[in-house]
Regions:
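Short, positively charged patches
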Residues: 1-143
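A short, Lys/Arg-enriched amphipathic alpha-helix followed by its capping loop at the start of a domain
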Residues: 144-148
Length: 148
């Protein structure tokens, strides 16, 4: 899937009121993946719908089609190109298997390099705007884990 299209979908999921990581993952699973969730003409999905789910899906569609969402996705794409960052998302083969099992795992991950295969590793998933507490906690956690 084209990177900009994926970024638009991930942006819509993270910027639609009422949609968090857990509900985004549930919706993607229910509809058969991120692409199917955004296939608004999908007749097969009609049997899965009930009012609350369909209202959320329509809200996601509204956010997805907005100019603001498109601009956010373009900005992310430019950032990724400038920093040499790749993107993977929930449902892709290279999305970390153990992270997939977390109920509130992020729908998208930006990364440099490749994921180690068949190794135990620790990753810190964060935000670009962490709180002071979050920064300090992470710093202390990494300091404790580094010698291991």
């Amino acid at each position: 899937m084209e990177q900009l299209a994926v970024l638009k979908k991930l942006s819509a999921l993270s910027n639609t009121p009422g949609i968090g990581a857990i509900s985004a993952k549930k919706l993607a699973d229910q509809y058969g993946g991120i692409n199917a969730l955004f296939d608004f003409d999908n007749k097969k999905a009609a049997g899965l719908q009930h009012d609350k789910v369909e209202n959320l899906r329509q809200a996601i569609g509204h956010t997805y089609r907005s100019q603001d969402n498109h601009l956010r996705a373009q900005k992310e794409q430019a950032f990724m190109a400038a920093k040499g960052v790749d993107l993977t998302h929930y449902g892709q083969e290279n999305y970390p298997e153990l992270l997939r099992e977390c109920p509130d795992a992020p729908m998208g991950l930006m990364m440099r390099g490749s994921w180690p295969k068949n190794q135990i590793f620790i990753g810190v998933v964060g935000t670009r705007k962490p709180s002071k507490y979050g920064v300090e906690f992470c710093r202390e956690l990494i300091k404790e884990l580094a010698p291991l």
